[in-house]
């Protein structure tokens, strides 16, 4: 894959269930208030360690608020060597409406 692909929540859900990693690039407060179950928060501080430890060939799904910022982040991750990157269309907002029972909240806020 030389570029990322945009995918709907249904495809992201199936891919996540098959082992794809989901990274959430929203601000820490928004992530703490609700995020896709099993997703990992990714920001400028955690990015270098994430890239260093990641399997660059493992499917990676990027989510943001509405599916716009995730496209830039997905393109960046492709440029960093990730071979299978996806941007979640509709972002977390569409996910939480599509799969409300598949949302986690951090205990400490």
Curated annotation (Swiss-Prot):
User: Which Gene Ontology CC terms are recorded?
Assistant: cytoplasm
What Enzyme Commission number(s) appear in the record? 2.8.1.1
Instruction: Using the record's annotation, list all stretches that form the Rhodanese domain.
Output: 16-104
Q: Does the keyword Cytoplasm apply?
A: yes
SMART domains for this protein: RHOD
Which UniProt keyword terms apply here? Answer: Cytoplasm, Transferase
Catalytic activity annotation: thiosulfate + hydrogen cyanide = thiocyanate + sulfite + 2 H(+); thiosulfate + [thioredoxin]-dithiol = [thioredoxin]-disulfide + hydrogen sulfide + sulfite + 2 H(+)
Q: Name a biological process GO annotation.
A: glycerol metabolic process
| Major location category of this protein | cytoplasm
Keyword Glycoprotein in annotation: no
| Annotated localization | Cytoplasm
Q: What InterPro entries does the entry give? A: GlpE_sulfurtransferase (IPR050229), Rhodanese-like_dom (IPR001763), Rhodanese-like_dom_sf (IPR036873), Thiosulf_sulfurTrfase (IPR023695)
Q: Which Pfam families match?
A: Rhodanese
Which domain of life, per UniProt? Bacteria
Q: Which residues form the active site?
A: 64 (cysteine persulfide intermediate)
- Can you name one GO molecular function term for this protein? thiosulfate-cyanide sulfurtransferase activity
**Tell me, what does this protein do in biology?**
Transferase that catalyzes the transfer of sulfur from thiosulfate to thiophilic acceptors such as cyanide or dithiols. May function in a CysM-independent thiosulfate assimilation pathway by catalyzing the conversion of thiosulfate to sulfite, which can then be used for L-cysteine biosynthesis.
| Record-stated family | Belongs to the GlpE family.
UniProt protein name: Thiosulfate sulfurtransferase GlpE
Organism per entry: Stutzerimonas stutzeri (strain A1501) (Pseudomonas stutzeri)
Gene behind the chain: glpE
């Amino acid at each position: 894959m030389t570029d990322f692909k945009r995918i709907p929540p249904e495809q992201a859900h199936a891919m996540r269930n098959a082992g794809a990693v989901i990274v959430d690039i929203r601000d820490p407060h928004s992530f703490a208030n609700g995020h896709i179950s099993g997703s990992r928060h990714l920001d400028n501080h955690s990015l270098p360690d994430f890239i260093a430890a990641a399997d660059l060939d493992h499917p990676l799904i990027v989510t943001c608020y509405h599916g716009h910022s995730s496209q830039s982040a997905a393109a960046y991750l492709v440029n960093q060597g990730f071979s299978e990157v996806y941007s979640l269309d509709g972002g977390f907002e569409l996910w939480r409406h599509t799969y409300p029972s598949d949302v986690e909240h951090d205990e400490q806020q």
